[in-house]
A protein has these predicted regions:
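Beta-propeller and closely related beta-pinwheel folds
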Residues: 42-62, 90-94, 204-217, 249-425
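Structural hallmark of WD40 beta-propellers
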Residues: 66-69, 229, 341
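Conserved beta-strand element within WD40/beta-propeller blades
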Residues: 70-73, 232-234, 285, 344-345, ...
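Secondary-structure transition/turn motif
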Residues: 74, 84, 113-118, 161-170, ...
Length: 646
């Protein structure tokens, strides 16, 4: 008897394998579209180079001539992607002159001496005006206009760098060079802090480490937005810089606080987040200084906004619209998004709206939710006035009121997430497929390695209790949806590899980020042009003989064995091959046995597959594991018969 089994879209991990009636229970690199599961599209590297460090933010914008830019903020650099190339526009600190250098024969380590250099381990510094002392074995060109990573800081007046080769002579100190330090951004990973500052003075014995800590050392983050054709870039808990995409030769310029006509020299010098108001063009600083220029006055709940159209004017007067506001519910502002004519502001406990109301207050603030705080700065997205976000307590949406979202994969996500790394979580919108994607670090991972998706379009279409959710293991650290470019862009970080741009001599342990264009082809195309298969799979719940009859009469719940004789494939589309595995069990918690002859290799011309299997429960797994394969599955058709009770 040929029987058809229909499945609801989405993954159900809240139920047991047998209890998730008519549901899929596991997947990777699979999405749902009009109720049917399909492999996701591939992704292709946009450039042949890889970025040094881990990207945490992207922002797409255009200049007035229509040139398209994507700003990318990493833990080391601020980069611009422009039509197939990356450009370094990272702001520099003040140049330090009259430094000297020392080398040791047979070692790549060079010691640079400069009083009060202010550099820390991991900082990037560019060397300029280099005149080496004799006897080092190096040439001036080995250092001139080259970037180096600070390897160690023995004293406040010395630091070390590594050359690409060993020195052939020992020179105690000499020569002359200038230092151009890059503005530091922050660590590449979020950690709990230990040591000085993690507890109150006098807590514990001298020299004794704290057993635990609730002090989180946040990763290097950026706020990226545009003021027309001008990029506004703020380092988290640091300064704000601008880069003018409309300048005569913009890609030769660096972001700066002194950009002509767009200075930020009067801006706060320590802000967690910045953005530009969508209709009034105020530059808003969140979790910023109560006294501009004094970083010790940074208040994690304090907001400061500029004069309208005046991104460098913050002193309120009777004739401007600059001002301030302090929020109350929470301990720190975590994130903010523009939603039509409203700005949404999350603390670690609450949600506020910020709306333009005119004189005398300029903006009005209203608390619209509590116990719904944001888990990390980049863990929220907005589409057409509706915001979706991840909280330490679950998933939420705001469409005028805050709603807690039921989630059929909730335990799978929140029981295996490293909540101490919330600032590494990034949310992305893939509007073409009505998907909100959260990439997050699992409990045993230093970096993002898993994802969870809410398909808000499918949820509205099918109206399934709990919504249409699915999960997987692909890792991304930042995302920008198709706006000025026709496809989404995303970044992937590899901590074990070495980035190639910007070039850093003697680089060690910074990792690399690849910039991908998504929904392209079927595979992963790497920066060197090689192809890696994007594997995918989906697995069903444990079907019993009467699964399809639920609601028609009292269900016998696996009382009767089923005998399987034939599988009839029904793929809506199939490129290359798909692999289908049928598994059977005698009991829900029994070990699965693969049916005879499976896994089956299915092509577009496969009409049926004969097999033999017997059990109370049966499931199907559809997957692909080689390149140039893609599939979309329809309905499950099996030839099954009742086969007794033992």
């Amino acid at each position: 008897m040929l029987v058809e089994y229909a499945f609801l879209p989405g993954i159900d991990k809240q139920s047991s394998d047998a209890g998730a009636e008519n549901r899929w229970i596991d997947s990777d690199n699979v999405r749902f579209r009009y109720g049917l599961p399909e492999k996701v599209g591939g992704w292709s590297s946009l450039v042949t180079s890889t970025m040094v460090g881990v990207a945490r933010a992207m922002h797409a914008f255009t200049d007035l001539s229509g040139n398209r830019y994507v700003a990318i903020g990493t833990d080391k650099f601020l980069l611009i992607y422009f039509e197939g190339q990356l450009h370094d526009v990272t702001p520099l600190k003040a140049t330090l002159t009259s430094a000297t250098i020392a080398t040791t024969n047979g070692s790549p380590t060079c010691t640079i001496t400069k009083a009060a250099h202010g550099l820390a381990v991991g900082d990037i510094v560019q060397l300029d005006s280099v005149t080496l002392p004799g006897g080092t074995g190096f040439n001036n060109a080995d250092f001139e206009d080259k970037n180096f990573q600070v390897i160690s800081v023995p004293t406040t007046g010395t630091f070390t760098i590594n050359q690409a080769s060993n020195a052939s002579g020992t020179v105690s100190t000499g020569g002359s060079l200038s230092l151009k330090p890059y503005e530091p951004v922050g660590p590449r990973a979020q950690t709990y802090g230990y040591g000085w500052g993690v507890a109150s003075y006098g807590n514990g014995n001298w020299g004794e480490a704290a057993a635990a800590s609730d002090v989180s050392l946040e990763p290097g983050l950026w706020s990226l937005d545009n003021f027309g054709e001008v990029l506004i870039a703020t380092i988290a808990n640091g300064k704000t810089f601008t880069w003018n995409g409309g300048a005569a030769t913009p890609l030769t310029n660096r972001a700066s606080t002194a950009t002509s006509n767009f200075q930020t020299t009067n801006n706060p010098t320590a802000s967690r987040i910045t953005l530009v108001s969508p209709t009034t063009r105020h530059l808003i600083h969140l979790a910023t200084e109560t006294t501009i220029g004094t970083t010790t006055t940074q208040d994690d709940m304090f907001i400061r906004f500029s004069d309208q159209e005046g991104i460098n004017t913050y002193a309120p007067t009777a004739t401007n619209t600059a001002g301030t506001q302090r929020l109350q519910d929470g301990t720190k502002i975590m994130g903010a998004l523009k939603a039509k004519e409203t700005i949404l502001i999350w603390t670690d406990n609450a949600l506020y709206t910020m709306k333009f109301v005119g004189a005398p207050f300029t903006f009005g603030f209203e608390q619209v939710g509590t116990n719904c705080g944001l888990i990390g700065k980049n863990a929220a997205v907005e589409i057409d006035g509706i915001a979706y976000w991840m909280s330490p307590k679950g998933f939420f949406a705001f469409d005028g009121t805050v709603k807690s979202l039921p989630c059929t994969v909730e335990d799978h996500v929140f029981e295996n997430i490293d909540t101490t790394k919330g600032q590494q979580i990034t949310a992305g919108l893939n509007n073409l497929f009505t998907e909100v994607i959260w990439y997050y670090p699992s409990a045993n991972s230093e970096y993002n390695d898993k994802y969870v998706v809410l398909n808000f379009g499918e949820t509205a279409l099918v109206k399934i209790p709990g919504g249409v959710w699915y999960t997987g293991t692909e890792a991304r650290t930042s995302w920008v949806d198709a706006t000025i470019y026709p496809k989404p862009f995303a970044t992937k970080y590899d901590s074990t590899a070495t980035g190639t741009f910007p070039a850093i001599v003697g680089e060690s342990g910074l990792g690399q980020t690849t910039l991908f264009e998504h929904e392209v082809g079927t595979d992963q195309v790497n920066p060197n042009g090689t192809t890696t298969a994007v594997t995918s799979f989906i697995k069903s719940f444990d079907i019993d003989l009467e699964s399809r009859q639920r609601g028609q009469r009292e269900k016998l719940a696996g009382e009767t064995f089923l005998a399987l004789r034939r599988f009839v494939p029904d793929f809506k589309s199939l490129q290359g091959n798909a692999k289908v595995t049928l598994g059977v069990k005698r009991y829900p918690q029994d070990t699965q046995v693969t049916t005879a002859l499976s896994p089956f290799t299915i092509t577009s011309s496969t009409l049926k597959k004969d097999t033999r299997a017997r059990g109370r429960f049966l499931n199907i797994k559809i997957e692909n594991d080689t390149a140039s394969e893609s599939w979309r599955y329809g309905t499950l058709r099996l030839d099954v018969q009742p086969d007794g009770r033992r």
